[in-house]
Amino acid sequence: AGSDKGYTDLMDTDSGEQFDRLEGVTNDVTWLDDDRFYYVRSYRETATPDGVKPPTSRVFLRDGGQDEMVYGSGVPTSHGLSMGESLHSEKALLVMSYGWHRSTAIAGELASPDSWEKIYGGNDFLAYPIDRVRGKYLVASFEGNGWGQVLSIDDAGSVETVLGEGKEVLQGVISTADNLVSIYMVDASSIVRRHDLEGHLIDEFDFEAPGSVSSLTTDGSDFFFKYQSFTTPHRVYRLGEDGLNLLTSEDAPGDFDINDLWSTSKDGTRVHSFLVKKKGVKPVKALLYGYGGFSIPLTPVYFPSAIPLLEDGGAFIYANLR
């Protein structure tokens, strides 16, 4: 269940003054107006107001310093809730999760918690809402082989496939009124694709060095994301009508090679790793790091503690066990 404890402070952006504090494990503040907002409270040690044993979570409305539980009554133990809103702040978008392999997409009118209901999922696969566009919900679903697909669902529950399941893992996707931008994982490295809302590919972007793309967001017209790799702390990109543009970047000094490395385990399974070394150097020593658990892959991240090893002629090997 975890033992995290904390608080959330809410600040006035003009004055910088704190005007409210949420005690406990709270997340996903979603504003209704200047004075009212929803938030998700996680219960780790005590029962919920409706008497369900922890761990679980509930959605509350905060109004004038007073809390009212507005969603989640009866959600069982070991089920968690997360919450957001559609791009134009009209719809509430929620996920009810059970473990690492099952979730349900929930949505409804932002101002009316009584309208929040399941729109997809609930079986033994992950599903989460992306947005509400052109009168339909877009949902990411990981049924089938679990690679990920994007579905369009109307208010009657009719389902159409926008992006079908391929051979790459869907890591994230967001939408504007005209386009979808998705992140896929290929050999533990990210590529970025842009499609129209009918699922036609507009363009695709990979990177000179294998890396990880995260923090995908939009202002309603352009898309923004962060890229990082073993020797690159960050690069921030904007993807708009004029293509992909680099906004800011930082790289570790020096020239390095990042290559894919494949090994065969005792039972015949092929295991992928990244081999990082200084360009032109034949390593005489190496540090191998690996992890496997909770279906979490090890994708390229900036690893400053490996830089001295690389500068000293060594190699850094990053093994993917999931």
Question: Which stretches of residues belong to each language-model region?
Answer:
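Generic beta-strand/beta-sheet core signal
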Residues: 11, 40, 95, 108, ...
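A flexible loop/linker signature enriched in serine peptidases of the S9 family
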Residues: 1-7, 22-24, 40-59, 70-77, ...
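Serine-hydrolase catalytic core recognition
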Residues: 88, 210-322
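Conserved beta-propeller blade repeats
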Residues: 1, 23-40, 74-95, 115-140, ...
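Short coil turn/linker residues within repeat-based beta-strand modules
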Residues: 15-17, 64-66, 112-113, 157, ...
